[in-house]
Amino acid sequence: MVMRMYDIVIIGAGPAGLFAAYELITNNPKLKVAILDKGKLAEERICPMSKDKNCYNCNPCNILSGYGGAGTFSDGKLNFTPKIGKSDLMKYMDENEANNLIDETEEVFNHFGMDSKSYPTNMKQALEIKRKVAITGAKLMIIKQKHLGSDKLPIYIHNITEELIKNKVEVRENCDVLDIISKDKNSHQIITKDEKILTKYVIVAPGRTGAKWVQELADKYQIPYTSKSIEIGVRVEVRKEILEDITNVIYDPTIFIKTDTYGDEIRTFCTNPGGFVAKEKYNEYICVNGHALKDIKSNNSNFVFISKVTLTQPVTNTRAYG
């Protein structure tokens, strides 16, 4: 059996994988690139829970796996900032370079029609809200934001995927990668359930569902790694009008609060004006999430109070906890 040969194979078709393929093929159209994902194309990812509220333990899960990644059914918030929550681009580059990358990313989003009204809608009002928050001892972070909508994201992911196909990127779905055998720096063999694939380079970006597998690969090849902190929170739902004075100006306000008892820092996260609270099952765990559609609104809004937890010895591996 003749093995397929590529210049670059990308494992995982979430935002990292899709953007990597787009950048590679845009800068060098002659490259032979393939994307492998164990899930389905975005337009084929249908969760049975959306119809009868029952989880059938699909393998792989259509919510977590497939083109677009685990965020395909989120509400599509874009936060144009180099640092928020656990994410901090300035660990890897200076602030100017990070902001330039953010501008380039926004241009790609706009190229695919992923554009909407920018927040804050009124900077003067936003600064006044920030002042009022500061009086309470909390801190409001003002950043540029856009909201795309849960109902629109699969369409956008489909459009990105179609452009990659048009530019000769090989798009593979239902392709579960089991192992990578690295012979040397420029020769790798990818083992899937059905075949072996040869490639000069590999980009490993399997996302949330692939975290355990990546850790196993790192152990196999003695690649050092550290575990990031996890964030644990509760989702709160209120009548929409209670938050409108803020959310009409700042769509997803990030407010940092120091707790009185232990001095822990918590923050608001993932605000969904006129949104919906949804039950989600992650393997044996049942959680709640929130999202907001572009065209259909509820009478409620929801948000999360979230706290960062960093584990210490002897239990430092946060992967098993989220």
Spans of features found by a protein language model:
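Residues forming the flavin
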Residues: 2-82, 124-322
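Dinucleotide-binding Rossmann-like beta1-alpha1 core, especially the glycine-rich loop
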Residues: 66-119
